[in-house]
Structures are given as C-alpha cells and as structure tokens.
Amino acid sequence: MKVLFRSDSSSQIGFGHIKRDLVLAKQYSDVSFACLPLEGSLIDEIPYPVYELSSESIYELINLIKEEKFELLIIDHYGISVDDEKLIKLETGVKILSFDDEIKPHHCDILLNVNAYAKASDYEGLVPFKCEVRCGFSYALIREEFYQEAKENREKKYDFFICMGGTDIKNLSLQIASELPKTKIISIATSSSNPNLKKLQKFAKLHNNIRLFIDHENIAKLMNESNKLIISASSLVNEALLLKANFKAICYVKNQESTATWLAKKGYEVEYKY
C-alpha cells in the first residue's frame, strides 16, 4: 500500500506531529511525506521520500495523490479541515486516516486520537458512521526506547527534568527553571531549532545546577534519571505515563487543553501558562 503522510514541522509549529508520524510510519512498507519547507522544519531528518509542497492548497495535495497513485493518506495537520477531507475524498477516493487531538469533526475512514483521555464515544456524530475510531493510550505512538527504559530502574541523577517540546517558542523552560530552587539539579531538554536556545545556553552557564541537553539521543533515559518531570501537556505525557514517572504537565496552547483537563481529573499536577 502506497502511504502519504501530510504533516508539517517548524520552529513555530514544533516537532510533535512529525515525531509521532515517524513512529506510525514503521507500520507501513511504502511511505512518503508531503511537507511545506518551513523554517526550522525536520524535513532533512525524515528517512522517507519527501514531496516539498509550494503552498497549503488542498488542490496541490489532491494532484500529488492522483499523480503518484497513493492509496492511504495520513493527515496529521491542524490546518486541514473536515471540508478539506471531504474534497480530498471526492476528488481522489483515497483512504484517509486523520489524527485528532481536540475532538473535532473529521471525514475519514480511520480516526486516530493517541491521547490518553480519548475514547471512541467522544466521536459519535463527528465522524462517518463506518469510520474506524482508534482512541486512547493503547494507540499511543511511543518510540521504542521508552518501552526499553520502562524496564529499567535508574539511579536518579536529576531532581527535575524540564521539556517543553523541541522548539519551546515561549521560552517556558527558562522561566520554569528559574523558579525552582538553585540547590536542585535540573536537566533541560530541547533542540537546536529552539529560537530561544542562546538565552537557555547563557542561563545554563550562569547556573551550575542546570544541565542543558540539546538534540539528546535518549530523552527516555534522561526522564527516567529524574525525580520529577515538568513537561508540556503533549505527547510527552504518554511517555511519562509509560515510564510511570512523577510529573507535572504544563498546558500552554489550546490543543493541549483536553489532555490537561483529563490529567487534572485523574489527580495529576497541571499548570496553565498562556
């Protein structure tokens, strides 16, 4: 089956969509991606053929599907609406798998919500009657190193681990770290695409209790070596749940609200930073 992922990444959007798509992509043998070449994107790190789009036009995507005869379109993109999905289906007949994080309407054959809070009944009336709904933690897309790390009982090197995703455009990592006691050893994980990286590096140099990890290869181990995690209410939550870690979730964008609400109801520590 020829599979096309439609997803983007950038310094503004972050890396979460592409990262989880790459986990799902391992389930298929013939995979390609269609992406906009945005600033700070992960295009060069995608180990599959990438079609660089020139616009957000749905017709450009439709033409690509027709020309390359893709059989399954996997949409992981907040900018593609239910009406766009209907148009794609009408024009191409391609099978559609749509990611969703906000309990929104979709016109797809398979609906995938990988967040722990999600349940199939949430989508009654929001998706076609014959749509296959895949929801909840059992469908979480977590990298293999987390499953391996969950078996390890690591010595705790750090009092706190902070990660606000790969780009952290609001520079919350620095803000959170500066509010913690200077007697605590704090690890901060980020990426080289973080627009606030120089500020973080300067902060780390001025504080000998800060350990800054940039593009670290094994985030799972770092998390497992920490007494408490302070993480964004994103896919990091599923990873923390798998590790059975002590964590606090920070909600700072709208698409994290459902996860944050669910965590709070379950008794987990949640903080909102808008």
UniProtKB/Swiss-Prot annotation:
InterPro entries registered for this protein in UniProt: PseG
Outcome after substituting Y78F: Impaired catalytic activity
Outcome of swapping H17N: Strongly impaired catalytic activity
Catalytic activity: UDP-2,4-diacetamido-2,4,6-trideoxy-beta-L-altrose + H2O = 2,4-diacetamido-2,4,6-trideoxy-beta-L-altrose + UDP + H(+)
Binding site for substrate: F15, G16, R143, S234, S235, E239
Active site (UniProt): H17
Molecular function (Gene Ontology), one example: hydrolase activity
Disulfide bridge partners, by residue number: none
Transmembrane segments: none
Quaternary structure annotation from Swiss-Prot or TrEMBL: Monomer.
Function: Nucleotide sugar hydrolase that catalyzes the fourth step in the biosynthesis of pseudaminic acid, a sialic-acid-like sugar that is used to modify flagellin.
Family the entry assigns: Belongs to the PseG family.
Alphabetized NCBIfam families for the sequence: PseG
Protein name: UDP-2,4-diacetamido-2,4,6-trideoxy-beta-L-altropyranose hydrolase
